[in-house]
Amino acid sequence: MRPRSALRYSLLLLALAASAAIQAQPKTLAVCTEAAPEGFDPARYTSGYTFDASAHPLYNALAAFAPGSATVIPALAESWDVSADGLVYTFRLRQGVKFHSTDYFKPTREFDADDVLFSFQRMLDPQHPAHDLSPSGYPYADAMQLRDIIERIEKIDEHQVRFVLKHPEAPFLADLAMPFGSILSAEYAGQLIARGKGDELNSKPIGTGPFVFTRYRKDAQVRYAANPDYWKGKPAIDHLVLAITLDPNVRVQRLRRNECQIALTPKPEDVAALRQDPQLTVLEEAAMITSHAAINTRHEPFDDPRVRRAIAMGFNKSSYLKIVFGDQARPAIGPYPPMLLGYDDSIRDWPYDPERAKALLKEAGVTPDTPLNLYISTGSGPGGNPARVAQLIQSDLAAIGIRVNIRQFEWGEMVKRTKAGEHDMMLYSWIGDNGDPDNFLTHNLGCASVESGENRARWCDKGFDEAIRKARMSNDESQRVALYKEAQRIFHEQMPWLPLAHPLMFDAQRKNVSGYRMSPMSARDFSRVKLD
């Protein structure tokens, strides 16, 4: 070989080696998130912030939603059959699925029917040894009255389970795809309980999902490693970091400095500028979301529907939408967004009419300067800046004689306090988890949810409750539509919420990120992400 050719050959080898070294470097995806998780057992919580850190990266359920849609597809169950009467669901479980192996748990077997039975029976059976590991109960299972839906769960063999229902339940498959249906390791839970460390099920999670939990630094970050044994294949990124960043301005700053490659829910007013940045891409989704203020109907004088209607007529919703969202939201009139089954577009919003609102308050015997304690969280989510929204409510209601006291708490603290019913009003954004109206209605407004604390309005209307119960049990779509319209009319007349907006949702990412897709249910899945 001539010297010059040898030199070229050597340089080529060096270049190839350098390229291989670069490709071999671990790829870390950092995501700036809006709030800290409350824990890592999805069955114990209802917050999307918690699910982003638990259900989506760590676990799988029997079924799932197709990326970017509400279509139910197989997950840990590779297929299922439903009996003609809608009462028996038989699931064939996926084989060869491994639970995470960590420094605190080494599984000795693969996922099987015992894990399905454990994951559901702990919620359903008060005598189950794992039931009391969640001191506040299982909010979704309780609010959905899962015990009144499921007659029994049977293990047919290692790879088949059967759910027998007490009555038909239209959204049952979609319900099972929700985060509360995440499948945990019965083997791991049994070891923890035997050692008297059952609480670690919520702090040292083990699942079958795309990422393995490595560390949580409270209120700062959650770290994960790619699951090398993931049944769908190892994720393209090696490490995932959820960087808890309450301030949306700081989330954007960190994104621009490449400290985060994805920033969740930037402020709507920042979206236009973000779209002009050549290093960034803005993703947009018409999510299933209703931002609202739940009014505690157990507190006087807000137990009177006239007072709640007065609040609706005293609030300038058009001004609020313009100030908080620009043109990035539509007004909310009812409890769920227009894209869902049975939405009644014939219902008209209560008009902005401060004088009529004052007259209603006077008719209800409400004296001027009546206090209202409005609970809000720190940070900013899809419903906009809570403090700014609260100030607008405060200003408008002052004009009709209601003095709003704003009380702001960290997210988890606000959830705890409002679940206990301390508030007169609470700002909240509910994002649908399964693409069905029932997810908005039964969980947030059903009578059973009053006792569990998930119904922040503490409102129980028997006519409303009966309508949504019948709709949930019917497989006749036209009947469901009629029942949901009946429920919406009752809601509109009673006004347990001040419905605010159905906002668009936004996430921002750097140009070198691909494979991330938003979901109408706001489920964040980072398992398909690639970093170029």
From Swiss-Prot:
Protein family membership: Belongs to the bacterial solute-binding protein 5 family.
MF terms in GO: peptide transmembrane transporter activity
Matches recorded under Pfam families: SBP_bac_5 (PF00496)
Superkingdom of origin: Bacteria
Subcellular location: Periplasm
Function: Binds different tripeptides. Probably recognizes specifically tripeptides composed exclusively of L-amino acids.
Official protein name in the record: Tripeptide-binding protein
Gene Ontology process terms (BP): dipeptide transport; protein transport
Main location: periplasm
SUPFAM superfamilies assigned to the protein according to its UniProt record, in alphabetical order: Periplasmic binding protein-like II
Keywords: Peptide transport, Periplasm, Protein transport, Signal, Transport
Signal peptide residue numbers: 1-24
GO CC annotation: ATP-binding cassette (ABC) transporter complex; outer membrane-bounded periplasmic space
